[in-house]
């Protein structure tokens, strides 16, 4: 015999509340007392009631769904951003859909997927995405907020960290250690994030009377950074080896340290001091103990999601560009020196 489906009216009768109170109790962002919510949830568990979120979205014309677009999760920093964004949005009563930016550059296909999915807003975590792609999504009336990079387009809200100041600190700090041959390992050269970190780094060196000794590119990827380390360190004499390196992110910095240690038998920091950028969790592991610039990841996520929800509720809200400070985290990958402000 087919079991009769349980409705919100059944739950309301058992809990002794109105149907609208039942509906509000299943919407985390709705106003309802904790006492009422508890009564509704107990009644729902007793009856085996499950709200029909699809039907609700058709009635309210609200999917309560946010898309997160990223290029890859191989970098643990972006995996951490994704986790924190998901938890925060769930607390606000939203669901999260994950999209990966196509490697073949066919961004139109991604835009079509976002529109078909009827998402209410988009968080872009991909450092490879540019302002034209973000604007393409926004042109369809979908609110967009970019995290961890700034783009030269004022029509979209952006939340990033102070890349220039972080690079500036790295350049001055390495020079303060007495290092004379300081290299830079770039991420994606044309990205604004990389340009800001590189420009800050070179300005910091200049403040100490130095210039960048050597340069290579690791594209923010582990394997490419290993290849770059081999080019930078395996074809030189000891007198012409870089004695310090600033990498544009932690993943590349760790790749350099492991290549130096395991393949080239150059110890860190005795031969080479290394600094990264991000302060992802594994950077603090004893096997790495990487000096780095910590991005305020919790604050970035809170600010970005709050901005996105503001744009969803008020499409006329003006876009904001927020730049948050970074914090040096000095560990064993650099020798002791003077902590510069």
Regions found by a protein language model. Name each.
Residues 1-3, 61-172, 176, 234:
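Alpha-helical recognition/docking segments in bacterial nutrient-uptake
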Residues 1-63:
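N-terminal helix-turn-helix DNA-binding module of bacterial transcription factors
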Residues 14, 19-24, 58-74, 84, ...:
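Short beta-strand segments enriched in small/hydrophobic residues
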Residues 47, 117-118, 177-178, 232-241, ...:
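Glycine-rich phosphate-binding loop signature in dinucleotide/nucleotide-binding domains
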Residues 70-80, 98-107, 149, 159-169, ...:
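Hinge/beta->alpha junction and helix N-cap segments in small-molecule ligand-binding domains
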Residues 119-126, 183-185, 215-216, 237-249, ...:
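Periplasmic-binding protein-like
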Residues 234-341:
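Flexible loop/turn connectors
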